[in-house]
Amino acid sequence: MKKILSLLFILMSISLLAQPTQKPPLHGKNWMAITGKPLAATAGAKIFERGGNAVDAACAMLAATCTMWDVLSWGGETQALIYNPKTKQVIAINAMGVAPTGATPAFFKSKGYNFPPELGPLAATTPGTPGGICYMLTHYGTMSLKEVLAPAMELAAGYPIEAQTANSIEKGKAKIKEWPYSKKVLLPHLGQKREAPEAGEIFVQQDLLNTLQKMVDAEQAALKKGKTRKEAIAAAYDRFYKGDIADEFVRGVQEQGGLITKEDLANWQPVEEATTHINYKGIEVYKLQQWTQGPAMLQALNILENFDLKSMGYNSSRYIHTVYQAMNLSFADRDFYYGDPRFAINQPMKGLLSKEYAKQRASEINFISNNPNAGPGDPYPFEGKQNPFLDLLKARGFQPNADTSKTKNSFLPAHDAIVYNDINNAPDAAYMDRLWRGTTTVEAADKEGWVVSITPSGGWLPAVIAGNTGVGMSQRMQSFVLDSSINPFNVVAPGKRPRVTLTPSIAMKEGKPYLAFGVQGGDTQDQNLLQFFLNVVEFGMTVQEATEAANINTNQLWLSLGGSRLEDRKPKPGNLLLNNNVPDWVRKDLRGMGYTLSFEERTNGPINAIFLDWKHGSIWGGSSHHGEDYGIGW
């Protein structure tokens, strides 16, 4: 009987995959531009049509989407992967801001926080996106900053604001009113019943336009003096981070109670660094380093490579259980071992990403029931080293590299026992908002072979605008911890980058770019990207089918974003989010394995993706059918 049910499920899976998508796949021969807003995608298309490459177009889309407050602002952060067809290498761009002067555990604890705050001027790291755009454009683009920023500047001068953004402003207006410069920009109808812009109203951001114009003026003045293109863009960069823009930014930050100093801005710079990557069944999958959560997806792929996923059937109970367990194991490692490598000593990334360690972790999966106690493993022996944190792990109740499925309550640190109450209750709306907290993605490719994947964020609504710059500050400080027993590698310190959720992706096959993909959604990002990748590689979906396919989400992890209390971040072992369309018999199986189920119509992103079809010389694009994500190809 079980064999018959399994066969029926596989046949049903094939039938489901054959269903038409809600949005058509995008096709192009010359270029592809995809991001979170239609107007921002149009900005990329305009740059392509003016002769720019994929890096130029990606920078234009990034600038436009920042200007449109697509869950980020100009004061946020930029993380990018770029495939350079000239060197045939994938490049990692780290334009994440850092903790400012004075940002220490003692400082935040003195104010009653268990984590840095999620909103307000104390939540701000230094801005990274302006520097990230300047760096990418200088080294890998072809156009001037003036050309690339032109669409964003046109938007800042006034564009018809979308209902989603306008309503977000109205919803958050009570908080926005606490900050004078945010109130001035975002609430043009103060005193009226609706104080935010209406949908379709021309939304003007004069302060931001002035800031962008100052950067362009610095570039153009340098060119008139005979400076090179590189030197001219550097002049624009310096005006933002060291000149009069920096002066006003810091004045506005400190007036409102923030910590960022002129020295913090002047000392920060974007970094080009080595990628992190693994091979999954002949496909090289690239991520950023462990200051992001990206390697967690690579760890999960290494674990899942030990199983025949295709034979399980797409979203069968066994498949869901296997993916859930692999994600839990990799996220448990993320929550303890990941952090800014520049501040790390003896960080075990080689061990964490080794195939041998993955086999060890795969052997810990119990196929009878969920393991509510999955904790960090011990990757150090796989580097020939001894784990310096064994006493700490044991004090927290963890037994690395052991079957802990029947160990009572060992998932949580002893000092966090208070948050263990109601652990199997379905997550509430506030928890899910923190789990899914959004951003946007930028994906671009061209016929020359340039491929770009960017996951920017920070400065989302309700944001604190820094003085008269029009620039919303980042809120990424909340991703640090204050207690080394939670994660010894991610404790806040001045000049340090927080361990973020932002995670662009590029996959290579047979030495050529194969996929570029990204997603919004906080801690769910690498969960959804993992399943997108498996949907394409294991189940043969197109990029559009894979962006629309139903995924699962685990809540069995420490939240990276959210409240400043321990109970706001607590893991929820066994909590499993499923799509509304999951069949009854799958639900029954999963409940029998100890899962607490919740259901949503949207469980897949929104994901944006590009597939490079070398066989036919074309480019495919996939863009989620949820939200405003949009793509244009030619």
Residue ranges of each PLM-predicted region?
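Sec-dependent N-terminal signal peptides
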Residues: 4-14
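Extended C-terminal subregions enriched in glycine
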Residues: 331, 448, 495-498, 529-530, ...
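Active-site rim segments in enzyme catalytic domains, especially the processed small/beta chain
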Residues: 67-92, 109, 251, 259-261, ...
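M16/insulysin-pitrilysin zinc metalloprotease superfamily fold
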Residues: 294-310, 507-515, 523-547
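Short, well-structured alpha-helical segments that form the helix of a local strand-helix-strand
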Residues: 55-61, 146-157, 240-243, 249-250, ...
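Noncatalytic scaffold domains of N-terminal-nucleophile
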Residues: 19-42, 46, 52-235, 240-292, ...
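Internal maturation/activation junctions in enzymes
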Residues: 309-457, 601
